[in-house]
C-alpha cells in the first residue's frame, strides 16, 4: 500500500439550527461588509438567511446562474469591488457557490457557504467558468470556502425533482473518487459511507419530501462525497458533464444523474477494487445498473434527450471530451465514448 494523504477541507458547521452560527463565523473571519450571492429564484431565501447579520451586509447580488457565465462573474466582481465587500456569503447550490468561487479567485475575498442543495461545490477548490460555449475548470486554494454551514431546514423546500438529481450528483463525486489515481484509504472509507448515506436518504426523501432526518442524511452524504472530490483528480464522468453543460447548457445535476451509470459502466472492468466498494455501498451486484435504477425509480431523468440535447450533438461532445487528456482508469476510445453518449442520449440501461 502506497499513498500520500494531504487532506484539504473548509471548517464545517453541521446540523439543524446551525445557521445560528453565521454571526460568529463572520466575526471569526473578520467579515463586516459581506456580498450576499444567490440565484434570482433564491433571492428571498438569501435575504431571510442574511437578516440576522444585515448590519454586516454591504450588497446583495441575485444573478447567479448555471455554469457561471463570464458576464455574470464580471458583474458580481464589480459589485464586490464597488461595495467594498470584505467577504462573500454564498446562499444556494452549485451555481451560487460556483459564482462565489470566481469572485474569490479574482478578489481573494473569503467565502462563507450556506448550501441549499447537495451539489457539494462548497467542499472543493474546483472552480469553473463558461465563455463562448466552453466551460473551463481549474483548482485554486483561494476559492475554497473558509466556512460551510449545513442547515438541513434550508433544504426542506427544495423541489423533489431537484433533490433527487442533486443527491445523485453528490454520489458521482464519490464514485470517481474511488478510482482516482490520488485516492487514499481514508477517502475510500468516506466515499463508501457518503454514497450509502445518500442512497438511503434519496428513497426516504422521495417518500416524504419534508422528512428533516432524511434531508439531514442527504446533506451528510453530500458533505462526505464532495469532500472526496475535493481531494482527488476528476476523470471521464466529470469531464463529460462539464462538456455537456458548458457546450449545450444542459442542467448540471440532471446531466450528472444521466451520465453517471454510463461513465461507471465504461470504467467498470478497469476498477475492480472500486466496484467492490460500490457493491457494498449500493447494496447491488451491478453498480452501474443500481445507479440507473436509482434515478429511474425516484423520478429522475435517465436520457440526455430529455434534457434538451440533440442527437446530432453526440459526435461534437465526444470530440470535445477527447481534446484534453486527464486521468481515467480505462483508455479513452472515440467509438466506445460515442456509444456511451448514444446510450445516455436514448436513456438505455448502461453497458460496458
UniProtKB/Swiss-Prot annotation:
It comes from the Bacteria. Keywords: Aromatic hydrocarbons catabolism, NAD, Oxidoreductase, Plasmid. It holds the Pfam family Fe-ADH. It is an enzyme of class 1 (oxidoreductase). One of its GO terms (molecular function) is maleylacetate reductase activity. GO terms for biological process: catabolic process. Its EC number is 1.3.1.32. InterPro entries: ADH_Fe/GldA (IPR001670), ADH_Fe_C (IPR056798), Alcohol_dehydrogenase_Fe (IPR039697), MAR (IPR034786). It catalyses: 3-oxoadipate + NAD(+) = maleylacetate + NADH + H(+); 3-oxoadipate + NADP(+) = maleylacetate + NADPH + H(+). Pathway: Aromatic compound metabolism; 3-chlorocatechol degradation. Belongs to the iron-containing alcohol dehydrogenase family. This is Maleylacetate reductase. The gene is clcE.
